[in-house]
Every structure is written in C-alpha cells, then in structure tokens.
C-alpha cells in the first residue's frame, strides 16, 4: 500500500503540487476540509488540464464521509443500533447537544438532551437527519459482526478509486483525524498534504487530537512520529521551500518563530520594522494590514491574521500583539506563548510575496483611535 504524508510550509504550493501530480487517466478522489479549499482545487485542476479531468472527483471531507461511509451502509447502521426500521432523512449542519452545559450562574451540569454514543440518537436529529459533526464518529462506531464499517468502506473505495488525495490535512481533528488514519490503513493509495504549523488557525475545529492530547501540546517531532507509527511515509523535503516568501522573510520566520521554512523565491523583499513610519504605512492602501482580530473595525484595509490563511499579497503590515512586541530583540523567545497564537502569526507573516512590515502593539495603540470606525 502507498501511504504518504507531505509536510509543507506556507506558500510552497500544496494544492498546486497535488493537482499537477495526478494522472488524469486514473480515478482520482481529491478531498479537502472547506468549500474554499475545494474551489481552489477545482481552479488549479482547470489551470493544469483545462478542466477537471473526467475521472477525477473533488469533494469536501464531510460530503465524502456521508456519501461513501454512511449512506451506502445505512442498513448496517440500523442493525448495529438495533433500530431495524431506521431510514434517514438527509443531513444537517446544526451541532448535536453537548454532554455538559453551563447554567446561568456558571455551573457546569449534565445536559439532559445529550444521548450517549452507543445510541443512534447520538448521531441523528429528531427528524432523523444525520449530524454533520458526528459523521466520522458514527463511521468509526459501526461494525457488522467482527468487521468494521471503515474496513468495508475502504474495500469498496479501492474498487472505484485508484488514488485518494487529502489537502490541508492539518485542519482535521479528533474523530475526523482518527477516521482518516483508520481508513488509510486499508486504502491502496492515499496522499495527505498539509502544514503542521497552520493547525489551530481556522475559526473552528481548533482543539484536541492530534495536536493536543488532554492539556498537552503535541510538538512537530511527536506529530511526525505519530504519522510514522500509523504506517505513513513522511516526506519533509518536497514542499519545504516557499514559492511565495522571499529569503529574508523565511529567514526571519525561522529565527523568531523556530519554524523551518526556506525560500524558492528570487524576488526582492525585506522584513521592515515600521514604527517610525506607522501612520504612513497605515495610510497606504497598497499595503494590507493584518491584525489579530476585529479587522472590520478599522478605516484602513485590514484582515485578521487567521483569515488571511491561503492568501497572497504584494506586501503586508502585521500589527503585532503585546506578547510579540519585543520580537526585534535578540533574546526574544516564543516560550509561554500559546501555539495557536504563534501559528496565526506564522500565517500572517507568510502572506507577502514582497516586503513584510512589522508594527509593535505599543506603537499602534498610540494612534489606534484615529483609525477606528465610529
């Protein structure tokens, strides 16, 4: 079996690499976490082949799980939970009832609407729609005799797919991640591509396994070890160079954030602290400003650090938070700063294909009021 993971860096062309390495004569299945990722994949395939190849299918991960692991095996699901008359009514995106809830006084109590995972009602609404959020958990739960649903589904996928690709796999957590690992054990050919250091950046799906176990953060080396123990060949070389960021930017990210990133870019672009010209930078419409949050509150052209993920700009100014105010010091360290915050800054600092301007929080606070929309 061919099971590979390519660990990439920002701007290395993850989606480009996947879309240009496929064999259009084979039955390819390309999966990604968000609709935006799917849109990017389709565009890249059109650039590479003129259109999406006839034998290539592109879909979101949730659609994949529903179509290939849930819907075809509904009779087995009904039998597993001893609900033989069960017939589903589609799927919904509302969240299932949580196990615990908070009272008006802040007390954490058991939720009476919660149903344990050994009951079918844990996975469906009262109108018999599957909860999108528990699809992977359901797929992992069901067995027919001694054979798991996952193993049966993998055998079926091997009949109809020559290669399966999963883009931005760092976005998958908890049961989604577990399902990918378990399914991959039985697939003939699967390739995962993602950037470890872009985990915990999106607005949702930011907690838990594989990047956090209980209260402990999982470091890069431990994550690689987890993938290898699951039987994956881990490639840390193919996409280690950024096609977007200049050498100066990559070196600065490596020095300050400890992230191993190199440049494949010959373009000119420097890292410039702009505290002495802060107002001129903020007033320049050609320089996108990246802020930690509430970008819409400002008069200047701005975007939140995390929302800029996947984008490329000619030049950006990253407005730092208090914890990074001394990043220009030789003694600066990220020790004590939350991993999710470091990763969001990494995303922000790697958006520019030219100059990267950095502005201290202390500088911005002095002039901030003049730029707030009132």
Q: In which residue ranges do the predicted regions lie?
A:
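The feature marks helicase ATPase cores and/or their adjacent C-terminal helical subdomains
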Residues: 1-374
């Amino acid at each position: 079996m061919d099971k590979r993971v390519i660990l990439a860096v920002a701007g290395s062309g993850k989606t480009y690499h996947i879309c240009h390495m496929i064999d259009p004569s084979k039955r390819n299945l390309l999966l990604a976490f968000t609709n935006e990722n799917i849109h990017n994949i389709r565009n890249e395939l059109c650039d590479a082949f003129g259109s999406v190849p006839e034998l290539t299918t592109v879909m979101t991960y949730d659609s994949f799980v529903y179509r290939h692991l849930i819907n075809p095996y509904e009779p087995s699901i009904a039998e597993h939970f001893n609900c033989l008359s069960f017939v589903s009514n589609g799927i919904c995106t509302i969240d299932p009832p949580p196990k615990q809830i908070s009272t008006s006084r802040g007390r954490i109590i058991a939720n009476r609407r919660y149903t344990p995972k050994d009951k079918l009602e844990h996975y469906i609404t009262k109108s018999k729609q599957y909860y999108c959020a528990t699809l992977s958990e359901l797929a992992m739960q069901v067995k027919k005799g001694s054979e798991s649903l996952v193993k049966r589904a993998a055998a079926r996928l091997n009949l109809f797919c020559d290669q399966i690709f999963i883009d931005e796999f760092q976005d998958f957590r908890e049961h989604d991640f577990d399902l990918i690992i378990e399914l991959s054990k039985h697939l003939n050919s699967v390739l995962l591509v993602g950037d470890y250091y872009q985990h915990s950046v999106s607005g949702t799906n930011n907690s838990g396994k594989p990047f956090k176990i209980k209260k402990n953060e999982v470091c890069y080396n431990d994550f690689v070890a987890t993938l290898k123990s699951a039987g994956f060949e881990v490639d840390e070389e193919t996409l280690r160079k950024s096609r977007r960021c200049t050498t100066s930017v990559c070196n600065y990210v490596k020095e300050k954030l400890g992230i191993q990133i190199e440049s494949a870019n010959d373009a000119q672009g420097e890292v410039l602290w702009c505290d002495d010209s802060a107002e001129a930078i903020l007033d320049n419409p050609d320089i996108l400003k990246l802020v930690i949050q509430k970008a819409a509150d400002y008069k200047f052209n701005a975007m939140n650090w995390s929302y800029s993920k996947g984008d490329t700009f000619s030049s950006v100014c990253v407005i730092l938070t208090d914890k990074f105010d001394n990043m220009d010091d030789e003694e600066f360290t990220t020790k004590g700063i939350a991993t999710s915050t470091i990763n969001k800054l990494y995303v922000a600092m790697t958006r520019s294909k030219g100059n990267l301007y950095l502005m201290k929080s202390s500088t911005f606070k002095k002039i901030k009021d003049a730029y707030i929309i009132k």
